[in-house]
Amino acid sequence: MSTALTTLTAKLAKQFDMGDGSDLVNTLKATCFKSGTQVTDAQMTALLIVANQYGLNPFTREIYAFPDKGGIVPVVGLDGWSRIINNHDQFDGMDFAQDDESCTCTIYRKDRSHPVKVTEWMSECRRSTGPWQSHPKRMLRHKAMIQCARLAFGFSGIFEQDEAERIIEADAPKRIDPATGEVTTILFDVIAALDAVEACADSESLATVWKAEGAKA
């Protein structure tokens, strides 16, 4: 383990009263990254730098990460965003105004006479993923709050999960249907595919898995 990672882990452990942090690295890697991901010390160090900068607790998934091209995309959960907003010295409350089409968040600062106001639109933000289908207004409210907080307090280098997923998708290879011109993003999880193959008990199940994983690629 690198000196930087040891130092950052110890600092995090002290912040949350968890001893010296000597046995926490493997737990952190399992908590902060998708199961089965091979996490490097450099990736873990990068995440802990951000966690320490914003005072976020990775053990409760206030912050976690998506691996990306050897680096990471730091993802802050809703509880994490709530923490860094409410802990800001100049935070003086927020308001929301919402209808079926949009949500406007207004954040007030103690040191400014004019509040910061941001509007997010359902037509621009809604996706086909589960939360956006089951709780679209709640998701839009979260989006408006986070974008407003960025402008009000200058938070940078961190993302919410929806943004992180869009970043990963943008970097993923694309498949184009020559007949229709339709573009499909290929999200192929190599580690998950290998795990599925290794779990096969016979040639028949292997053929089934191989066919299913091949269709994804």
Feature roles, as predicted:
Residues T185-L206:
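Charged/polar low-complexity intrinsically disordered segments, enriched in acidic residues
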Residues S203-A217:
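Amphipathic, non-membrane alpha-helical rod segments
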